[in-house]
Regions:
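Generic structural signal for short, solvent-exposed loop/turn connectors between secondary structure elements
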Residues: 1, 52-56, 420-424
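Hydrophobic secretory-pathway targeting helix
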Residues: 1-49
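Alpha-helical transmembrane segments of integral membrane proteins
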Residues: 4, 10-21, 347-636
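Soluble extramembrane regions of membrane proteins in the secretory/endomembrane system
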Residues: 33-342
Length: 636
């Protein structure tokens, strides 16, 4: 049966915009929240304070805050760090290293001893240590206090012992916000950690954020303890981007909605990946611009040949702060995540199911040459099914995630097919495919425009599927509809050609690379990062590589080959490459932490730059490459 194209197209467009209308309240709420929370603050890690060289008599804190630092991260120093002089007049040694005259004053001679040599702070430091290690004991010898912890030094080398209370006193008195970073608690219990935190927050009201450090979350295995503490005391829990800390996710979940995003790059990553300073500054800016990160920790540059200077570091801070200010980032302290209206989720859930069922029906129509969307009864069943699935998905999140994942895949496939079936009017085809991605992408974004997804506490499982499913769908329908000269049985019944083997290997390799590179910085070289940053500065939003370098240029070349009836056996490669553009564009809408206007601008930039680049490549190929190829062929 032939498809009633005009009726089907009308029903398809009507239901598509119905879904968009239902998703609009969620999109408006998201845009309002993104505008209201456009704020980002720079944070300095106090662990690096001693490494900064400054002119004698200059106040480092004042200079840093004048440059643009808004908060300070206070790490809980480990025994190893105390032994290296991380805190003035404080050190930690094995008990066996003490003089016998001091050691014999303790009830037993083993353990780790924290030596406190500052009389003005010794009492406060002892109060913290007594709560952090209840079984510890302290003795005084003149103006020096020895506090012994009943755990061997090797156990406390990577465990939290004592923060820099002197700096905390100074900054808290000045009202400067503090980010306290408790280290792993191998030497104390969760109850002791909680008591020490209660004492610390009571003594220093400027502590606003908790940011656990180390490979293992503080209070492990009770990973929810720290998050619950933050929530009860009105603190924020830092959600560190790309963190590999064991137990961090459960800590953040326990603190919800008292969560704030934080981006930091440690010294080892900078050295390993050779991240030069301009790239580091741009990376932090992109974290704020593309992922709405509110706290940016700018550490010293380990790649500089000489010792870090305060003036140089302050120059970096000023440059980054100026760029943030110029682009509308305010200096407001972050607040707990808001709650979205329930009615928005209700409408957007139905919208997502309408989109998925609509795209599924359209693909079935294409594959089997039947008409579904022209039948009123079928449209009624589709609408009723969408409502039922939408309501159920509010209580079974798996339905929303599956619906979103498959809707994204079918959307990219449909956009690719729409654009390529308009090969007689190429510009119209490219525009219609892109508009379909925009409308469908907004519907998907509307369903997941809720704080849990915007703050990445819940992850969308359809990102990878939205990249791979369209390739499979296009390949199946092309073989079935004989877009490729051979049918699937014919291909399978003959031996594979060497060109097909090479092509299959290239496609498989490309798919693997695409999956590995679908993150922000994974498997991306320094030179490519420089190129990305240049594009971002020129265009305002960097187009994605799969769109402007691969997919849309492939669409332009395919249009030409189709119109000229050339290379019929190899055009399928270009058709599959075209799906990468639309898959990537849909994929951009699935990054729900990215501001929506940036997603729209990035998609548009990828579309027009890709078509322009494809046109230039086609012109060069036809004007210069084709004559050269003919001449070589005649010589052979």
């Amino acid at each position: 049966m032939m498809i009633k194209t005009r009726n089907n197209a009308g029903a398809f467009v009507c239901f598509l915009f119905l879904a968009l209308a239902l998703a609009t309240p969620s999109l408006i709420w998201r845009l309002f929240q993104e505008r209201a929370n456009r704020s980002s603050l720079l944070v300095f890690d106090l662990m690096e304070l001693h490494a900064l060289n400054a002119d004698e008599g200059r106040n480092k804190f004042a200079a840093l805050m004048e440059a643009g630092i808004s908060a300070f991260m206070v790490p809980e120093c480990t025994a190893e760090e105390l032994g290296k002089g991380a805190i003035d007049q404080v050190t930690a040694v094995p008990a066996a290293d003490l003089p016998d005259s001091v050691l014999k004053r303790f009830s037993y001679p083993s353990g780790t001893v924290v030596i406190l040599r500052d009389p003005a702070l010794a009492e406060l430091q002892q109060e913290y240590l007594k709560r952090r290690f209840k079984n510890g004991e302290g003795v005084a010898d003149g103006q020096t206090v020895y506090f012994k912890i009943p755990h061997p030094y090797v156990q406390l080398e990577k465990a939290g012992v004592l923060p820099d209370l002197r700096s905390m006193q100074y900054l808290s008195a000045a009202g400067v916000p503090l980010v306290f970073a408790p280290s792993p608690s191998m030497g104390s219990s969760g109850e002791e950690l909680e008591e020490s935190l209660t004492f610390l927050c009571g003594s220093f009201p400027s502590v606003k954020v908790l940011c656990p450090t180390g490979e293992i979350a503080a209070a492990y295995p009770d990973t929810e303890l720290l998050g619950s503490f933050a929530k009860r005391h009105g603190l924020l829990m830092a959600q560190v981007e790309f963190s590999r800390q064991y137990g961090a996710a459960r800590q953040v979940a326990a603190a919800w909605p008292n969560v704030v995003s934080l981006h930091a790059v440690d010294r080892e990553e900078v050295l390993k990946r050779n991240i030069i300073r301009p790239l580091m500054l741009n990376r932090l800016y992109r974290a704020a611009e593309e992922r709405e990160v509110h706290l940016l920790v700018l550490r010293l540059d380990p790649l500089r040949a000489v010792a870090p200077q305060l003036a140089e570091y302050c120059g970096d801070v000023k440059a980054l702060r100026a760029r943030l200010d110029e682009n509308g980032f305010k200096r407001l302290w972050p607040v707990p995540a808001p709650s979205s209206p329930w009615i928005n989720s209700f409408f957007s859930a139905i919208a997502l199911q309408i989109l998925f069922l609509l795209l599924l029906a359209r693909y079935v129509e294409r594959y089997f040459d039947i008409s579904l969307l022209s039948r009123r009864r079928f449209l009624g069943v589709l609408a009723a099914t969408a409502v039922v699935l939408g309501v159920f998905s509010l209580y079974a999140g798996i339905l929303s995630r599956l619906g979103g994942a498959f809707a994204a895949g079918f959307l990219a496939a449909e956009a690719s097919l729409v654009s390529m079936e308009r090969w007689k009017v190429p510009l119209r085809g490219a525009a219609e495919g892109f508009l379909l991605v925009l409308v469908g992408g907004l519907v998907i974004a509307g369903r997941f425009s809720v704080p849990l997804y915007m703050y990445r506490l819940s992850t969308f499982s359809g990102v990878k599927l939205s990249l791979l499913l369209p390739l499979v769908l296009i390949l199946l329908i092309d073989v079935h509809k004989r877009e490729h000269p051979e049918s699937l049985p014919e291909i399978l019944s003959r031996p594979p050609l060497w060109g097909e083997i090479a092509l299959a290997g290239a496609l498989l390799l490309a798919a693997v690379v695409m999956l590995l590179r679908s993150g922000n910085y994974g498997f991306v070289g320094t030179s490519e990062i420089v190129f990305r940053d240049w594009l971002e500065k020129i265009l305002g939003a960097r187009p994605r590589t799969k769109e402007f370098l691969v997919g849309y240029p492939a669409l332009v070349v395919w249009y030409y080959l189709k119109r000229q009836e050339m290379w019929s056996h190899w055009r399928e490669v270009l058709r599959l490459a075209v799906t990468l553009a639309f898959s990537s564009a849909v994929n951009s809408f699935c990054h729900f932490h990215t501001p929506l206007p940036l997603t729209l601008l990035r998609g548009f930039n990828g579309w027009w730059t890709g078509l322009l680049l494809g046109s230039l490549l086609l012109f060069v190929g036809v004007r210069f490459g084709r004559p050269v190829f003919r001449r070589l062929r005649s010589l052979l």
